[in-house]
Amino acid sequence: QVSAGRALLGLLVGGGLGLFLGLLNGSSKMASTLLDTTLQMIRNIPALALIPLVILWFGIDETAKLFLVAVGVFFPIYINTYHGIRSVDPQLIEMGKSYGLTRWQLYKEIILPGAMPSILVGLRFSLGLVWVLLIVAETISAQAGIGYMTMNAREFLQTDIVLVGILLYALLGKLADVLAVTLEKYLLRWHAGYQK
């Protein structure tokens, strides 16, 4: 329960920010010019390489764990959202404008549906990545969670509990993937590639 809460909160913070900046940079050339190259530079730094800095900044409390997970899931969602927005057919947007659609209607009816397959790929990738990051984050002086349980069991050479921890991470990852696929099928039910 503690691990799932950390994963969900990290996904909401990092994923929400990634979605917002992906939409912003994908839609605005000025925002893209100002922000995208900086974000791409930061993306090349592995999230796990930030651990010493995160401990210096946030200590070893929940904020450090949340930050690591959020940074890790930010980039898959950001990149896929940015790419999805940029790859929407410009002719469809022009056609929408010629029909008198407002900017909000263009987003709702053309841009977001066109970018949705790419956005959901980013979400699915992030849902897999969140558990990897959480394993590492929970080894940073956690007092609860699967990572804490596993590290504690390692200290006492309890192989069975370590294996249970690994199995729990695998099951949570599988559950997250099933939820992502279900969400894909629901949100893309109009898309020919997702129809039964």
Predicted regions: what is each one?
Residues F67, V71, W104-V136, D160-V164, ...:
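Transmembrane alpha-helices
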Residues S3-L11, T38, I42-L48, V88, ...:
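Loop-to-transmembrane-helix entry motif
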Residues S27-L35, D61-A64, R103, Q158:
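Membrane-helix interface segments
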Residues L19, L23, M30-T37, N80, ...:
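Membrane-spanning helices that line or support transport/gating and their immediate boundary helices
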Residues Q40-P76, H83-G84:
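Generic hydrophobic transmembrane alpha-helix motif, especially the helices
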Residues I85-Q91, M95-A115, E155:
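Short helix-to-coil transition segments within interhelical loops
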Residues Q1-L24:
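Transmembrane alpha-helix signature in integral membrane proteins
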Residues L56, I85, V132-Y169, L188, ...:
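Glycine-rich helix-loop "coupling/hinge" segments at transmembrane-helix boundaries
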